[in-house]
């Protein structure tokens, strides 16, 4: 599979997020998916349950080593500082993300955790960026409509 195909799987995970921010992540080892998840902060009432953190915990447990070897992470939104630190400490080799996060992005948009933590991790953003951005835009649009109602059309 290629980067776009793995990101498509992450998008599918994001679409299962129910009332959570629709972010999906897929952890890949030797070109095989070893973990997939969406955000679960609202579902679990735990603000730390980001999709990235969940797949790292599940995936590294499956391979039996907390140091990722030949592991790639695909996530629909640029990781936040907490997730970026977890990625680096887990020694994940490559990170591919879809949409850039101009508020909290920790791999270049706002800050660069890989430089701060002296990591040699490979990072590439913008994989299926439009699709990843659209799912987030639609989520926030729906939230606004639920809060304030649909905007009235004027002729």
What is each residue range found by the language model?
Residues 23-31:
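Short beta-strand scaffold segments in enzyme catalytic cores
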Residues 34-41, 120:
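Short beta->alpha transition motifs characteristic of CBS
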Residues 25, 63-65, 113-115:
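Short secondary-structure boundary/capping segments
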